[in-house]
Amino acid sequence: MTKISQIVLVAGAALSVAAPALAQNPDQSRAYSAELAADAQTRSSLLAPAASGSNGFTISDQSGNYKLTIGGTVQFRYTLDTRSDGVQGTGPGATNINKDDSLSTGFSNSITRIHFGGNIINPDMTFKVSALINGSTQNVTNAAGAAIGTTNNGFVLEDAYGQYKFDNGFSVKWGQFKLPTIREEIVGDEYSLAAGTSTINTLFSPGRTQGIELGYTAESFRAMFDFSDGMRSANTDYTNGAEADYAMSARGEFKIAGDWSRFNDFTSFRNQDFAALVGAGIHWEQGGNTNDGFNGTNATFGNETFLYSIDGALEGSGWNAFAAFTGSNADGDQRNSISTYSLLLQGGVFVTENCELFARYEGIFADSEVTGVGAGNELDPSDFHFVTIGSNYYILPDSHAAKITADAVISVNENAGLQNLVQSTSANNKFGAGVPNTNNGVLGDGDSGEIAFRLQFQLLF
């Protein structure tokens, strides 16, 4: 067979196969096109980015009953902290910071986080797992030359919970999650107005716990009630002495205007209407009477802790305002009852479509006997004041997905005493010390005028 004959034979075979398709009527052609489009839509949804660009990538079946979302946070920061030379010593008036450490500068990955979420069986059965990739070091030493803080590297489990929403507005959550007492902690660092959460949040935040939460959401009201292992008890076993014997938390919120999603952050973009929210949260726990022997250091003394917070938010077209009053009382078998209070005021306004200016005030009013009783033990000063001013530049308008933040945290008075503000003379304290704090850049100063400059780039994916 010649080459020309072969070509003719192949062409004829191709025409015979294509002839039925060419002979299709218009209805058959439209049906076939619709089938192809449906198949393409199903395949493209397997790895589709969320519309906002900051809610992760989603893998889903066609029904939507099984869905997996993968996302994360990367915050890269440059910090410059300037302060007076440290005051040697370990008492309430000392900084516990090396005398030569009047200037600290450098880069850090302030937050690197990855999270998985979605639903199984149906959209009402949801789950979330998140982990923090931790690799930070606090290069601060006390008078004896010992390092303050520890170096941790690796994955740290944060959230690990399941949740089911009922048709009547109720929901139940179980696992490891944030306690709902303080709104700033609920919102988190990624959606904070400044480069990070406040010193107040560092002191009072109940953090994550393991437990059960019952929730209810209506048109203008929602509430949460938790029974848990207590504040800051994430990643502990039931035999751990650091856990509370029992703990209960509750939070209620009234939405005056706007949608609930408006209060997932503190910012209000120019294309958003007026919104207002009033909320209050409480937490109470009793500990130290069980698990003693498994962790003798943490379960040596009985203790009772009460935490409460009242907050309000106003948001408009391109502006926002927020206020919160937070207080606590810590009482124990072998320590005094200590009460501490705080006030946070903050607000922001957009000056362009992408640029937002903001300011924040923090006042912390501590019990003067927080470090003990008697002459020389009183905390002086017992009030601490901070002012933060800065700007956010949203690379993608109306989205936190790519954001540059520049701010300065100014200590109005000396703040070295914040390192003693642990509200306890025993190891079972549940509150954090205010300094040194690499999140807000404040390392502690025996004089007024410490300033921490922060320049941060954020990516959410």
Annotated model-derived regions:
Residues 1-14, 228, 245, 306-307, ...:
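Domain-scale selection of a single, long terminal region
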Residues 52, 56-233, 241-260, 264-277, ...:
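Outer membrane beta-barrel
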